[in-house]
């Protein structure tokens, strides 16, 4: 189970989500947790902005505790706005500020409706296909164990989000990184609470890489079968003509 400070963080993030408005599209691990059933703890908020205006802080001023927050800007540029909110949370290691990251890199794709999102309970959230695509790209391009865990979750719960090339790329990354090494890193992060699961059952994540590869193999075969059925030539039915012969 999560600690009290983590539960408070989850509640605060939900409150903030209902203040940000329609210009910001929710994405990332926390979006997966809140709206698509991910069972691990995620502590940050990530958004894509539709317009050039990436100032989300104005939207947060209506929060009942805003006057008690300390806000620290980490980065402001044409394509990024990163800041933290110190709302008084503490962990055994010290202060526990909330990180918020807004990106403007996808605004043209969003305006052209090339990235699908929906409004769920008043919050604009990327569709699962888009989040899965982003998570796949993250897993392939960086070495964070949470991406490894999330890919396994997505393959299990949302297999429709992956085509054959996606499956090949993920399998290649696991083989390149080493299945045993990935398993050890995942178990270590769970044991040291760097990666928090709702049910901390080490047995469930043992051989996690092998489970992913087995699932990939099954999904790949299913896609192959579907492709064969789709492209199977249709036989024209013979019919009898007026003279009793076989028509063409």
Predicted regions span which residues?
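Structured mid-to-C-terminal alpha-helical surface segments
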Residues: 1-24, 37-40, 49-52, 56-248
């Amino acid at each position: 189970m999560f600690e009290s400070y983590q539960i408070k963080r989850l509640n605060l993030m939900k409150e903030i989500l209902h203040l940000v408005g329609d210009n910001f599209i929710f994405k990332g691990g926390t979006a997966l947790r809140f709206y698509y059933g991910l069972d691990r703890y995620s502590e940050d908020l990530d958004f894509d902005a539709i317009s050039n205006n990436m100032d989300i802080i104005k939207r947060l001023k209506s929060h009942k505790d805003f006057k008690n927050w300390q806000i620290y800007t980490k980065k402001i540029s044409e394509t990024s706005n990163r800041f933290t909110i110190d709302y008084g949370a503490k962990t055994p290691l010290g202060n526990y500020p909330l990180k918020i990251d807004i990106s403007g890199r996808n605004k043209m794709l969003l305006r052209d409706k090339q990235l699908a999102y929906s409004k769920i309970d008043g919050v604009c959230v990327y569709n699962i296909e888009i989040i899965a695509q982003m998570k796949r790209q993250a897993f392939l391009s960086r070495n964070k164990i949470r991406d490894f865990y999330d890919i396994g979750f997505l393959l299990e719960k949302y297999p429709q989000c992956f085509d054959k090339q996606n499956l090949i790329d993920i399998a290649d990354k696991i083989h390149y990184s080493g299945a045993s090494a990935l398993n050890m890193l995942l178990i270590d992060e769970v044991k040291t609470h760097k990666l928090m699961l709702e049910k901390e059952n080490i047995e469930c994540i043992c051989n996690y890489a092998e489970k992913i590869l087995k699932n990939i193999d099954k999904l790949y075969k299913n896609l192959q079968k579907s492709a064969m059925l789709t492209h199977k030539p249709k036989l024209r039915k013979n019919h009898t003509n007026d003279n009793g012969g076989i028509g063409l």
